[in-house]
């Protein structure tokens, strides 16, 4: 039987991998987006684990909202990256510093 602490350990490892990825690799925007998604997966794992072990469905409902926001984030982020690569030829973070509002 898998206990709550096992889920929390897994979630904290995934969260730490996402944080390390953000701090170590600051040059590629796609990698930064993937690390943000890892952090969201860790949060979703916590919500589902607590929801299961506490016996209510509120955490699972929150997961659906988080997944919806994450899907919108990825769609908008990849659209911006596609346009950035088409116009500038690179998706480096240094190139995005010169974006105009």
Curated annotation (Swiss-Prot):
Enzyme class: translocase
InterPro entries: NADH_UbQ_OxRdtase_chain4L/K, NUOK/Mnh_C1-like
Record key words, sorted: Cell inner membrane, Cell membrane, Membrane, NAD, Quinone, Translocase, Transmembrane, Transmembrane helix, Transport, Ubiquinone
Pfam families (UniProt xref): Oxidored_q2
GO molecular function: NADH:ubiquinone reductase (non-electrogenic) activity; quinone binding
Cellular compartments per GO CC: NADH dehydrogenase complex; plasma membrane
Lineage top rank: taxon: Bacteria
EC number: 7.1.1.-
Protein topology in the membrane: Multi-pass membrane protein
The reaction(s) this protein catalyses: a quinone + NADH + 5 H(+)(in) = a quinol + NAD(+) + 4 H(+)(out)
Listed transmembrane segments: 4-24, 29-49, 61-81
Signal sequence extent: none
GO biological process, one term: ATP synthesis coupled electron transport
Compartments, as annotated in UniProt: Cell inner membrane
Protein function: NDH-1 shuttles electrons from NADH, via FMN and iron-sulfur (Fe-S) centers, to quinones in the respiratory chain. The immediate electron acceptor for the enzyme in this species is believed to be ubiquinone. Couples the redox reaction to proton translocation (for every two electrons transferred, four hydrogen ions are translocated across the cytoplasmic membrane), and thus conserves the redox energy in a proton gradient.
PANTHER family (UniProt xref): NADH DEHYDROGENASE SUBUNIT 4L-RELATED (PTHR11434:SF21), NADH-UBIQUINONE OXIDOREDUCTASE SUBUNIT ND4L (PTHR11434)
Family affiliation: Belongs to the complex I subunit 4L family.
Subunit: NDH-1 is composed of 14 different subunits. Subunits NuoA, H, J, K, L, M, N constitute the membrane sector of the complex.
Protein name according to UniProt: NADH-quinone oxidoreductase subunit K
Species name: Ruthia magnifica subsp. Calyptogena magnifica
């Amino acid at each position: 039987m898998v206990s709550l602490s096992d889920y929390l350990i897994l979630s904290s490892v995934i969260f730490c991998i996402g944080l390390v990825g953000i701090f170590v690799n600051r040059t590629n925007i796609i990698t930064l987006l993937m690390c943000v998604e890892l952090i969201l997966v860790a949060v979703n794992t916590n919500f589902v684990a607590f929801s299961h072990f506490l016996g209510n469905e509120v955490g699972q409902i929150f997961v659906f909202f988080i997944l919806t926001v994450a899907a919108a984030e990825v769609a908008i982020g990849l659209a911006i990256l596609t346009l950035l690569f088409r116009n500038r030829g690179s998706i480096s973070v240094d190139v995005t510093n010169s974006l105009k509002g």
